[in-house]
UniProtKB/Swiss-Prot annotation:
Gene: Pdp2
PROSITE patterns per the UniProt record, alphabetical: PPM_1, PPM_2
GO MF, one example: metal ion binding
Family: Belongs to the PP2C family.
Cofactor section: Mg(2+)
Gene Ontology CC annotation, any one: mitochondrion
Transit peptide residues according to the UniProt entry: 1-69
EC code: 3.1.3.43
Organism: Mus musculus (Mouse)
Co-factor remark: Binds 2 magnesium ions per subunit.
Binding site for Mn(2+) 1: 144-145
PPM-type phosphatase domain residues: 107-518
Name of this chain's protein: [Pyruvate dehydrogenase [acetyl-transferring]]-phosphatase 2, mitochondrial
BP-aspect Gene Ontology terms: T-helper cell differentiation
Catalytic activity, reaction form: O-phospho-L-seryl-[pyruvate dehydrogenase E1 alpha subunit] + H2O = L-seryl-[pyruvate dehydrogenase E1 alpha subunit] + phosphate
Length: 532
């Protein structure tokens, strides 16, 4: 590979910010706290997206303060082989085939594939997949953290439990309460489908369970025999978890580890996009700028994209109107500054970020209680024009879609993917990948494989000229997101260069990228539809 591209990217990034040499390190003149911004790079691929769903009308310069911790100007002529590039891209990938049945009918989810590529260190994105034991509904979530990973980690671990409890019948909730009261094992709530690389906080699970119990006690008081509807459950779960995150840091906590972790969770933030699939019923809840789309194949074979979410940011006209309705007219000009909420945050909805939700007095009182704020990765000041909080909400927008045979796959991803690729680009890439892999790969579970069959399939693939660099669809999307030029063409040199950027430089060119592709079982969907 030519080193020209990687050398140009490094020098371009370095020249964006005036640097001062200090000892044997390089420092930026700009403020070094990247938490003042949740920046997003902009790709021309997004220009076709509607403004009403929150996509920017044009590009803007990336502004990211960083400290380059290397010694002098290094020789940045790094070279990766295609095999090394693929190894880096595939390090976080995962795939899972769903074998569950519901009343004798195979699950409407056939399989799902995911991957994650970090730009931050440590990565601030999280993901989650679980089956609700009581309802057999499957839940998929993408959680994009900012100001650190603590909030995204907490939401990824806890949100599905709130959702599962919300859907429980009154009788099941009574059984949960009785078991807890008598110190007996709880009924199974979730069946997690974890990736080996998923991290788990174990130190504060008892605190979390206490708050979850308070929630199901309140649900018991409502005396709803069948539990909340799925839409209600999603709305309640998002807002209740965010409220508990806020309350946990206000309550006195004796344990220092728990106290400081709760502080980090509350003062960092996370956007979230969550899908719940049960038979033909697909619900998607979104708060922030993660995104979910459906890939649809019409009867004539043509493919189209069906967006299921809208980005909650400064380019979403409906979101701007909501903010203006919730605050005095005198603040109309200061709600959004430089395309950010109060000039600080890109998304207008998120978990955590209590510094955009609490009053100034409450913030001062909480932070004055002896917390360890030295290492806390939070905003160091209250934004200007902070008059009528809260300015930020975790209330999601919920979309319902009844699955049809033509609905083939669902893509959920953090904004790191959508910064680089438009909705239609993603569908096109998934379909192209299916034509290269899915239609030419024997399904060993469906028919016996022998050498003759394998040879026939290999000859078919060779004759058609089709091949794929990746078996995992999410990996395929990430490869094209960071390796394609402005014309959508893959450039191996660009791809390798983007993967060899130092951590502090990489964040100027791309965000953490987390992608999940859920494939539906068309035959099962047909069966569910016939059964009504």
């Amino acid at each position: 590979m030519s080193s020209t591209v990687s050398y140009w990217i490094f020098n371009s990034a370095r020249n964006r910010i005036a640097l001062l040499r200090g000892g044997r390190r390089l420092y930026s003149r700009a403020a070094t706290s990247r938490n003042l911004l949740k920046w997003r790079p902009f790709s021309p691929a997004l220009a076709s997206s509607a403004l009403k769903c929150g996509s920017p009308p044009g590009g803007f310069a990336l502004r990211k303060a960083y400290r380059h911790t290397s010694t002098e100007e290094e020789d940045f002529h790094l070279q990766l082989s295609p095999e090394q590039v693929s190894d880096l891209l595939r390090a976080g990938e995962s795939s899972h085939k769903v074998l569950d049945f519901n009343n004798g009918v195979p699950n409407s989810v056939l399989r799902f594939e995911s991957n994650q590529l970090a730009a931050n260190s440590p990565v601030e994105d999280r993901q989650g997949v679980a089956t609700c034991v009581q309802t057999n509904g499957m839940m998929f979530g993408i959680f994009d953290g900012h100001g650190g990973h603590a909030c995204a980690q907490a939401v990824s671990e806890r949100l599905f439990y709130y959702m599962a409890v919300s859907l429980m019948s009154h009788q099941t909730l009574e059984q949960m309460e009785e078991a807890t009261e008598n110190m007996k094992p709880l009924l199974p709530i979730l069946r997690w489908l974890k990736h080996p690389g998923d991290s788990i906080y174990k130190d504060v699970t008892s605190v979390h369970l206490d708050h979850l119990r308070v929630y199901w006690q309140e649900l018991l008081d409502l005396h709803m025999e069948m539990g909340l509807s799925i839409e209600e459950a999603l709305m309640y779960s998002f807002q209740r978890l965010d409220s508990d995150i806020s309350l946990e840091i206000q309550a006195p906590l004796e344990d220092e580890v728990t106290r400081n972790l709760s502080l980090q969770v509350a003062f960092s933030g996370a956007t979230a996009c969550m899908a719940h699939v049960n038979g033909v019923h697909l619900h998607v809840a979104n708060a922030g700028d993660c995104r979910a789309i459906l890939g649809v194949q019409e009867e004539n074979g043509a493919w189209s994209c069906l967006p299921l979410t809208c980005d909650h940011n400064a380019w979403n006209e409906a979101e701007l109107s909501r903010l203006k309705r919730e605050h005095p007219e005198s603040e109309d000009r200061t709600l959004i500054i430089d395309d950010r909420l109060l000039g600080v945050l890109m998304p207008c909805r998120a978990f955590g970020d209590v510094q955009l939700k609490w009053s100034k007095e409450l913030q001062r009182n909480v932070l004055a209680r002896g917390f360890d704020t030295e290492a806390l990765n939070i905003y160091q000041f209250t934004p200007p024009h902070y008059y009528t909080p809260p300015y930020l909400t975790a209330k999601p927008e919920v979309t319902y879609h009844r699955l049809r045979r033509q609905d083939k796959f669902l893509v959920l991803a953090s904004d790191g993917l959508w910064d680089m690729l438009g909705n239609e680009d993603v569908v096109r890439l998934v379909v192209g990948h299916l034509s290269k892999v899915g239609r030419h790969k024997p399904d060993l579970d469906q028919r016996p494989a022998n050498l003759g069959l394998m040879q026939s399939l290999l000859l078919q693939r060779k004759a058609s000229g089709l091949h794929a660099a990746d078996q995992n669809t999410a990996t395929h999307l990430i490869r094209h997101a960071i390796g394609s030029n402005e014309y959508g063409e893959m450039e191996p040199e660009r791809l390798a260069a983007m993967l060899t950027l130092p951590e502090d430089v990489a964040r100027m060119y791309r965000d953490d990228i987390t992608v999940m592709v859920v494939f539906f079982n068309s035959d099962s969907i047909d069966t569910y539809c016939k059964e009504g």
